[in-house]
């Protein structure tokens, strides 16, 4: 790696350790020419699948879109922003680990609903009402009854 101070081509690694829960490698380096020290972070370059929308269009996966959907569902609910970030990161990692090139948006919606069911049941019902296009109160009632049954069986 070139030195960011003098642009010399030779640097040596002084120290390496894992960072951000093992997702990155932090390296302390020293320039062989000017003796300046600097830190670099190394991450794997992973490609996320393209999302197949319900109309057949394809778009790149967008963490922020998932985060916005979660924030909207969790609006005025007692859930920390760190919990939202954890859900986004978990879905991101899961999709990366699967290694598929394309994924239907409906599958991402189901992943979000499962995460919300564990995180906050009110937010789950909110999200489900939009995601599944509830038309009347009966649809809400049915979803809540399913949720109550699932909670009792646990």
Curated annotation (Swiss-Prot):
Protein name, UniProt field: Transcriptional repressor NrdR
Q: Which HAMAP family does the record associate with it? A: NrdR
What does the cofactor section's free text say about binding? Answer: Binds 1 zinc ion.
Report any one BP term from Gene Ontology: negative regulation of DNA-templated transcription
Keywords attached to this entry: ATP-binding, DNA-binding, Metal-binding, Nucleotide-binding, Repressor, Transcription, Transcription regulation, Zinc, Zinc-finger
Q: Where does this protein come from, organism-wise?
A: Hydrogenovibrio crunogenus (strain DSM 25203 / XCL-2)
Q: Which GO terms describe its molecular function?
A: ATP binding; DNA binding; zinc ion binding
- Entries under PROSITE patterns matching the protein: ATP_CONE
Gene this protein is translated from: nrdR
The residue ranges of the ATP-cone domain are 49-139
In residue numbers, the zinc fingers (unnamed) are 3-34
Outline what the protein does.
Negatively regulates transcription of bacterial ribonucleotide reductase nrd genes and operons by binding to NrdR-boxes.
Which InterPro entries does the record match to this protein? ATP-cone_dom, NrdR-like_N, RNR_NrdR-like
Tree of life domain: Bacteria
Which family, according to UniProt? Belongs to the NrdR family.
């Amino acid at each position: 790696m070139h030195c960011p101070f003098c642009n010399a081509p030779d640097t040596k690694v002084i120290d390496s350790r894992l960072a951000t829960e093992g997702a990155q490698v932090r390296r302390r380096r020293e320039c062989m020419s000017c003796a300046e020290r600097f830190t670099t972070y190394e991450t794997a370059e992973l490609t996320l699948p393209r999302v197949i929308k319900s109309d057949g269009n394809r778009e790149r996966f967008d963490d922020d879109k998932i985060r916005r959907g979660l924030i909207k569902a969790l609006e005025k609910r007692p859930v920390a922003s760190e919990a939202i970030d954890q859900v986004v990161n978990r879905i991101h990692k899961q999709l990366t680990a699967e290694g598929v090139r394309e994924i239907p948006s409906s599958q991402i919606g189901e992943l979000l609903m499962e995460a919300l069911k564990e995180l906050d049941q009110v937010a789950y019902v909110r999200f489900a009402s939009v995601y599944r296009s509830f038309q009347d109160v009966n649809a809400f009632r049915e979803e809540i009854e399913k949720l109550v049954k699932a909670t009792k069986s646990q």
